[in-house]
């Protein structure tokens, strides 16, 4: 059994931390039944994963993609362009309709201050000691 070291793999994967992540992910894949690309030689899954990386029987870029997909909680979905899909609220309206015709009631500063004067602050509740 040949000993696999980080130096055997570091020229294939530049960062040691990435190497550990990729090897661990590959070892989990092997544990879940993924096909081996080299002979096991009575080695455990992490050693087999490192040997596969060192012998370049698997692509580190493919492993990185698989790792990212396995860690994603939400799958990205390409949304259709907004100009090709009509808006939900505009069933009878055309796509080119101008949405700036929203009626907004304007309030002057004096009206706002009069409204605020009518508001009373909430009553303070006495704190209970335990």
From Swiss-Prot:
SUPFAM superfamilies: RPB6/omega subunit-like. The gene is rpoZ. Coiled coil: none annotated. Keywords: DNA-directed RNA polymerase, Nucleotidyltransferase, Transcription, Transferase. The lineage of its organism: Bacteria, Pseudomonadati, Pseudomonadota, Alphaproteobacteria, Hyphomicrobiales. It holds the Pfam family RNA_pol_Rpb6. InterPro entries: DNA-dir_RNA_pol_omega (IPR003716), Pol_omega/Rpo6/RPB6 (IPR006110), RPB6/omega-like_sf (IPR036161). The keyword Transferase applies. One of its GO terms (biological process) is DNA-templated transcription. This is DNA-directed RNA polymerase subunit omega. GO terms for cellular component: DNA-directed RNA polymerase complex. The RNAP catalytic core consists of 2 alpha, 1 beta, 1 beta' and 1 omega subunit. When a sigma factor is associated with the core the holoenzyme is formed, which can initiate transcription. Its EC number is 2.7.7.6. It comes from Nitrobacter winogradskyi (strain ATCC 25391 / DSM 10237 / CIP 104748 / NCIMB 11846 / Nb-255). GO terms for molecular function: DNA binding; DNA-directed RNA polymerase activity. Residues 79-98, 108-130 are annotated as: Disordered.
